[in-house]
């Protein structure tokens, strides 16, 4: 039974991700050969490491400025009709803007391995000015994530127990009339939705016994727990430990994941290739990145995500590379091992987290941008647009400094009719991948830092700029660490200065 609650709270192979250098463009060739002689190139590489007390290390450990973190939610505008089988219609609400402070906790160096271990730590502070008229008190209708998640998990793992959930729902969740429930944005994201554990029914007690063991649920009082998307981990270190290369011996390997959760391979997917752990932890890039792109180990997606070079460009007077990311097509032979079974594969540019996170969640780009039109048309109210919904980032290649980044990821839930659950009994017979919310995590360097980047002959200044913005790329494609594994065990809170609204 306990395994069901991975939903609430539930890398590092010997292979290395090298940043192979292709033939540089004429422009960058001139920069590297004339403005950066060999000894300066060597110095830059050596400075872009995670050595103790270095400027890069300090910024890597705790970002000096916050990311802008925007959340857009989807309001179900026809909840009663949808509960009876009608097509679901959505209205986007947002953005709700937060300052996201990124840091690392429980840091330990291992000099013999040239490695460092740590736990990710994120703190969110509501930015009322950037949110405009939105306050968090707005009322929206969403599918009750706990009901849908529990129904899916129990049906898959312990189907003979599904009747207990149906009996417990009225007591746990206030006897909702449909699976689409009214919530405030503030409660859904941070303050928490109530879970009643007065244990007046034996089925209710079964679930409450599990909830009380689970740090993903915040105890409000003796009879009530609270559950939210971000609340329990706001300002709290992630329990899963990373071990990454410090890059002192080989600067090309800085940030390369050596172990994740004390393991050098995963045990999630059906083939060794998909279980590989390789790439960076997303929080630092080496100097002299190339058009080959680079890999990121997206821990909460249980997979490696690869960037793709798009073009060279002049970014406000700085020679730069533009990269993008998509999630590929599970139908491709190399990615087929990411499917939940050989027969059940989602369509392109989606990630099924059922096996990874123990919950029927699907990751995509916002509004199913670059995904199959079937997903876009299954619900009303979606309008995918490249300029608003793609993942894109621009990097000054010599220093590995991101000058602009837009990381946009949508989280969806698989909503299916279930004849054993009263609230799911009358849903449309066709399964739907229903958008819940999407995030836009971004940064653009201000003129202060851009002007220093333009002074390419100023090596020390250039390296320090890289240090300042290293943490601004943190999170990258590992955004799901903030929303998906609600069920992973959490540690004691730190960074008490954080708040939600």
Per-region residue spans from a language model:
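Extracellular or lumenal secretory-pathway regions
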Residues: 2-319, 326-501
């Amino acid at each position: 039974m306990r395994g069901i609650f991975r939903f609430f709270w539930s890398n590092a192979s010997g292979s290395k991700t090298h940043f192979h250098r292709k033939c540089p463009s004429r422009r960058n060739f001139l920069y590297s050969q004339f403005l950066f002689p060999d000894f300066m190139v060597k110095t830059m590489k050596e400075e872009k490491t995670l050595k103790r007390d270095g400027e890069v290390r300090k910024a890597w450990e705790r970002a000096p400025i916050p990311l802008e973190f925007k959340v857009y939610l989807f309001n179900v505008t026809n909840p009663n009709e949808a509960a009876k089988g009608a097509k679901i219609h959505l209205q986007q609400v947002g953005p709700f803007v937060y300052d996201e402070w990124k840091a690392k906790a429980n840091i330990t160096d291992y000099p013999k391995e040239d490695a460092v271990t740590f736990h990710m730590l994120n703190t969110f502070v509501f930015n009322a000015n950037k949110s405009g008229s939105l306050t968090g008190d707005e009322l929206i209708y969403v599918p009750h994530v706990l009901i849908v998640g529990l129904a899916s998990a129990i049906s898959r793992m312990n189907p003979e127990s599904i009747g207990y959930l149906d009996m417990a729902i009225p007591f746990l969740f206030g006897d909702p009339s449909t699976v689409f429930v009214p919530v405030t944005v503030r409660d859904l994201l941070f303050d928490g939705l109530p879970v009643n554990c007065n244990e007046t029914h034996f089925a209710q007690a079964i679930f409450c016994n599990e909830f009380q063991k689970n740090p993903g649920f915040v105890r409000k009082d003796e009879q009530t727990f609270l559950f939210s998307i971000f609340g329990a981990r706001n300002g709290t270190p992630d329990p899963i430990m990373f071990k990454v290369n410090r890059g002192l011996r080989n600067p090309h390997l800085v940030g390369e994941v050596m172990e994740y959760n004390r393991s050098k391979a995963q045990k999630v997917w059906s083939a060794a290739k998909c279980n590989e752990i390789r790439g960076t932890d997303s929080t630092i890039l080496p100097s002299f990145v190339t058009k080959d792109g680079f890999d990121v180990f997206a821990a909460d997606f249980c997979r490696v995500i690869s960037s793709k070079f798009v073009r060279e460009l002049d970014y406000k007077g700085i020679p730069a590379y533009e990269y993008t990311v998509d999630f590929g097509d599970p139908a491709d032979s190399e990615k087929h091992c990411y499917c939940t079974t050989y027969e059940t594969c989602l369509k392109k540019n989606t990630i099924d987290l059922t096996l990874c996170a123990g919950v029927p969640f699907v990751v995509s780009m916002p509004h199913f941008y670059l995904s199959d039109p079937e997903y876009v048309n299954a619900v009303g109210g979606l309008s995918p647009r490249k300029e608003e919904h793609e993942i894109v980032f621009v990097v000054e290649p010599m220093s590995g400094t991101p000058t602009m980044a837009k990381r946009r990821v949508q989280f969806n839930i698989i909503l299916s009719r279930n004849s054993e659950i009263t609230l799911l009994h009358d849903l449309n017979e066709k399964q739907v991948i229903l958008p819940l919310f999407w995030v836009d995590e971004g940064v653009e360097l201000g003129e202060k830092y851009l002007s220093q980047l333009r002074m390419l002959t100023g090596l020390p200044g250039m390296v320090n700029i890289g240090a300042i913005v290293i943490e601004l790329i943190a999170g990258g494609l590992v955004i799901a660490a903030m929303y998906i594994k609600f069920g992973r065990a959490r540690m004691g809170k730190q960074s008490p200065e954080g708040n939600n609204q």
